[in-house]
């Protein structure tokens, strides 16, 4: 899913590069939006540290039980407390690319970092092909993404049966402290999402466009309600396009370029959530990530969010991969499954709202109509 979605998005740039300044402004704003969102989320998790509400004895027991990745990570950290350039290079470009992605054995799952790099490289290489062949590659990648999305949907249909069992297992192993930790985690996530959407994005509107923030949020309220109720950026796209053209007065060329691309490449709420979950689960297991690792996490959360399918629960496979990348037991994802649906609805609102803000800002910066 990560490979197909990200590589396909890169291949599309071959068709969009002719739009020049529009594309450059859009991608710069996408990256800035998601980076700010992740940074805010990580600051919040480091400030409130919801995972620290769990007793230290419980953390030790969890590390012992899930051992493997967590224990190896703690050992590595004692030997290499700070991440250096060589470590970062090895994370992105291992000696055995296929082995790193697939996992060395049944006890070691693959890592997401080399996969992201390979997807970007393959997509960039495909851009150099002649249009007909490039289109064939893009169609193949899109088909792969659709197939993987179908598999994820099948797994998500089983979730209502699996989640109660996983929550029961978590409570038995961790105790009732987990509910306090989850409560602090949820409130922290919601607070940061509100802060980013209605404060950061309002500042963007005020400084970079001609729109009044209050009038803007009032005009797109139906779009945000649709996003919250469907938990899907893709399902909200038709409503967002209509609001952009009819209510916000955004040029059709700008709206038609920014919003569809934003449903897969401007996932601020998703990126924010990914960073928060990784730090929270790391705290639950008693694992401290260094500043260098958290900086790497910020970038990975941004790139990982780009690869997330715009469907309910689409970020869960990415989060599992991020946990593995930082040596945190992937089983820890079970801790947040019970509250994921509420936060999924909320982060979709942030994703869609930020898409419309970006389209508004890009349209204001463009000034003149972009030729078709």
Q: What is the meaning of each model-derived region?
A:
Residues 2, 159-162, 232-240, 254, ...:
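Transmembrane helix boundary and interhelical junction motifs in multipass membrane proteins
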Residues 9-18, 53-54, 130-135, 143, ...:
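Juxtamembrane helix-boundary/capping and inter-helix hinge elements in multi-pass membrane proteins
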Residues 18-25, 139-154, 215-226, 242-249, ...:
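Short amphipathic alpha-helical coupling elements at transmembrane boundaries
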Residues 25-36, 183-200, 219-224, 295-308, ...:
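Small-residue-enriched core segments of transmembrane alpha-helices in multipass membrane transport
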Residues 25-35, 39, 43-55, 59, ...:
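Signature of multi-pass transmembrane helix bundles
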Residues 53, 275-372:
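Transmembrane alpha-helical segments and their short flanking loops
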Residues 108-114, 153-156, 191-192, 206-216, ...:
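Membrane-interfacial loop-to-helix junctions in multi-pass transporters
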Residues 222-305, 358-359, 371-372:
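Helix-loop-helix junctions within the multi-pass membrane cores of secondary transporters/permeases
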